[in-house]
């Protein structure tokens, strides 16, 4: 499933190609989607190309070919009001209980929105509600939950619709599954690895590509410690 911005950009490119036979410039795309910078357009174009919706033609400036349009899928997504979001301040802090009875009480963990287990999405900052979590699922420190959207981590057992329980942390070890904030704009749930001087954000689905980024573009916002799933 495409995010709202990805779908809007795909439709804009397709309509421009039908009208004039020439794809829009990056400045025109930026203005059409009301984005602040062209870097956001570059990321959206890359995501659409990785998912097989467009193709960039080599040796030709601004040459983009639309391969397919996910009409039904995108329309369904828009009806649901898909608005991915992640992380704000005032995160729920888990404190040691003063008695055995208190230690058995469920802990209210704030749900901070949705996180992409797929192509990175724009990060908004909204707190929606809380969920009750058994205290033995949590360690010390601050915790929050994010609703997973996408299928890029299915081979790690993380499914679309799962609630990811996150321990707030600004660092990670190689192999940890983390909430990564990219360029202070996009957030994604991926496996973290160091590759020399770079950071690799790895999916757990062969349909998605590993993203290699310099450390100054990636901020760790927390580590996955468990999943909360309703049946």
From Swiss-Prot:
Listed Gene3D superfamilies: Umud Fragment, subunit A (2.10.109.10), Winged helix-like DNA-binding domain superfamily/Winged helix DNA-binding domain (1.10.10.10)
Keywords: Autocatalytic cleavage, DNA damage, DNA repair, DNA replication, DNA-binding, Hydrolase, Repressor, SOS response, Transcription, Transcription regulation
GO cellular component: protein-DNA complex
E.C. code: 3.4.21.88
Residue spans binding DNA: 26-46
Residues annotated as the enzyme's active site: 152, 190
Catalysed reaction, written as an equation: Hydrolysis of Ala-|-Gly bond in repressor LexA
PANTHER family reported for this sequence: LEXA REPRESSOR (PTHR33516), LEXA REPRESSOR-RELATED (PTHR33516:SF2)
Family annotation (HAMAP family): LexA
Name the UniProt record assigns to this protein: LexA repressor
Organism: Bradyrhizobium diazoefficiens (strain JCM 10833 / BCRC 13528 / IAM 13628 / NBRC 14792 / USDA 110)
Gene (UniProt): lexA
């Amino acid at each position: 499933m495409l995010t709202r911005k990805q779908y809007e950009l795909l439709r804009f490119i397709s309509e421009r190609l039908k009208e004039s036979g020439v794809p829009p410039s990056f400045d025109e795309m930026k203005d059409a989607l009301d984005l602040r910078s062209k870097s956001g357009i570059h990321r959206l174009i890359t995501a659409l190309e990785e998912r097989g919706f467009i193709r960039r033609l080599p040796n030709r400036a601004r040459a983009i070919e639309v391969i397919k349009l996910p009409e039904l899928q995108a329309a369904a997504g828009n009806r649901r009001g898909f608005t991915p979001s992640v992380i704000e301040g005032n995160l729920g802090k888990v404190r040691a209980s003063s008695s055995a009875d208190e230690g058995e009480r469920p802990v209210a963990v704030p749900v901070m929105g949705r996180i992409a287990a797929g192509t990175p999405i724009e990060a908004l900052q909204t707190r929606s509600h809380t969920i009750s979590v058994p205290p033995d699922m949590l360690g010390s420190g601050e915790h929050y939950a994010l609703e997973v959207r996408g299928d890029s981590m299915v081979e790690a057992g993380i499914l679309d619709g799962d609630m990811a329980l996150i321990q707030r942390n600004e660092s990670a070890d190689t192999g940890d599954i983390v909430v990564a904030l990219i360029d202070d704009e996009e957030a994604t749930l991926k496996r973290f690895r160091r590759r020399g001087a770079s950071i690799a954000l790895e999916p757990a689905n062969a349909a998605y590509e590993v993203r290699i980024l310099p450390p100054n573009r990636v901020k760790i916002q927390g580590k996955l410690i468990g999943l909360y799933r309703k049946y």
